[in-house]
């Protein structure tokens, strides 16, 4: 008992068992090695040089970018089947460690690394849990003159400050749809906050969007600028769209065009979310309001964009004019903050208490 049998047949069987075990271990080892070897998009299953080139041309040049894409997107840009696109995305997610479950305590630690940009107003910062968050879309809506664009100008200056002063040492991308960006106002805010106005202007990249298609294209081009500045001392940390819905509203009129408009707006918001999460930037969008003829009580206005925008924005803030030239900000929706209000002023410093 316990001794190895001298029977040749038994020895042979034992040897085969050991051989199969070794082969099994070798296959497992090779499989693990193969999984670890996915470093570039060419390493993904089904991605050859031609497909890789098409993906790169469309902006999908990293595993992370592919991991957060949709199968339909890859199908269109690479000319592959939806099934093949899904396999590529799943492999990219696994390689980039995206789309997997995480313990809540680990997720809490991850959220602690989220950056926040001061608005310039302590009361508004407190309402927003410390400022405008990175990895999120903050929507601010209100009537003309409520302070939406003034807040955007202030944030474009504040984000360039060091973290201890309320900034993120970052650059800004500004997509202007209504010709409301004013470099003169940036200079004024920067000067009154003790900054070099010329240096501040150098780190704001502005593009005018002339229609909704152009607006969506500029978001894609914004990613190129984000990548270009990624490893510099002033990476992009804030993307502003002022205003988000004006072109969509003017181009798609009537109930017959509503479905197409909302579908297009949903795609636009998905692209903004992808940039916010992939590059850890804050996305700040302004929105207009429209009258509610059926409202007999309460506020007679509502933001444009419907349920698509309501569910896509991480935080929603309603601005209105208050007494004595002051402005009132009301936090309408946030996943981690209670509703509340903050009062601020618009001065030569931009937004302040």
UniProtKB/Swiss-Prot annotation:
Superkingdom, taxonomy of origin: Archaea
Function: Involved in DNA repair and in homologous recombination. Binds and assemble on single-stranded DNA to form a nucleoprotein filament. Hydrolyzes ATP in a ssDNA-dependent manner and promotes DNA strand exchange between homologous DNA molecules.
Keyword tags: ATP-binding, DNA damage, DNA recombination, DNA-binding, Nucleotide-binding
GO MF annotation terms: ATP binding; ATP hydrolysis activity; ATP-dependent DNA damage sensor activity; damaged DNA binding
Gene name, Swiss-Prot/TrEMBL: radA
Pfam families per record: HHH_5, Rad51
UniProt cross-references to SUPFAM superfamilies, sorted A to Z: P-loop containing nucleoside triphosphate hydrolases, Rad51 N-terminal domain-like
GO biological process: DNA recombination; DNA repair
Name of the featured protein: DNA repair and recombination protein RadA
Family indicated by similarity: Belongs to the eukaryotic RecA-like protein family.
Amino-acid positions noted as binding ATP in the UniProt annotation, renumbered to this chain: 142-149
HAMAP family: RadA_arch (MF_00348)
Species per Swiss-Prot/TrEMBL record: Pyrococcus abyssi (strain GE5 / Orsay)
């Amino acid at each position: 008992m316990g001794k190895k049998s001298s029977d040749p047949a038994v020895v042979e069987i034992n040897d085969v068992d050991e051989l199969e075990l070794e082969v099994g271990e070798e296959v497992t080892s090779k499989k693990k090695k193969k999984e670890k070897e996915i470093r570039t998009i060419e390493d993904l299953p089904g991605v050859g040089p031609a497909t890789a080139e098409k993906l790169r041309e469309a902006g999908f040049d990293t595993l992370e970018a592919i991991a957060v894409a949709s199968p339909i997107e890859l199908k269109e840009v690479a000319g592959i089947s939806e099934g093949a696109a899904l396999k590529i995305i799943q492999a990219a997610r696994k390689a980039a460690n995206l789309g997997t479950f995480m313990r809540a305590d680990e997720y809490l630690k991850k959220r602690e690394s989220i950056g926040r940009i001061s608005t310039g107003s302590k009361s508004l910062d407190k309402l927003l849990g410390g400022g405008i968050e990175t990895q999120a879309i903050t929507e601010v809506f209100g009537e003309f003159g409520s302070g939406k664009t003034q807040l955007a100008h202030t944030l474009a200056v504040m984000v360039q400050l060091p973290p201890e002063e309320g900034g993120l040492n970052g650059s800004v991308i500004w997509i202007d749809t209504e010709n409301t960006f004013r470099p003169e106002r940036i200079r004024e805010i920067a000067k009154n906050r003790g900054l070099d106005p010329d240096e501040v202007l150098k780190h704001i990249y502005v593009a005018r969007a002339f229609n909704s298609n152009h607006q969506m294209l500029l978001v894609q081009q914004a990613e190129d600028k984000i990548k270009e500045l990624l490893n510099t001392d002033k990476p992009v940390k804030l993307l502003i769209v002022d205003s988000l819905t004006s072109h969509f509203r003017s181009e798609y009129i009537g109930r017959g065009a509503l479905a197409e408009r909302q579908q297009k707006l949903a795609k636009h918001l998905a692209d903004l979310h992808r940039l916010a999460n992939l590059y850890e930037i804050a996305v700040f969008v302004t929105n207009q309001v429209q009258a509610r003829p059926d409202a007999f009580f309460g506020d007679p206005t509502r933001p444009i964009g419907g349920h698509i925008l309501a569910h896509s924005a991480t935080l929603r803030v309603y601005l209105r004019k208050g007494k004595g030239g002051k402005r009132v900000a009301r936090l309408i929706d946030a996943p981690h903050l209670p509703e509340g209000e903050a009062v601020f002023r618009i001065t030569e410093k931009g937004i302040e208490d």
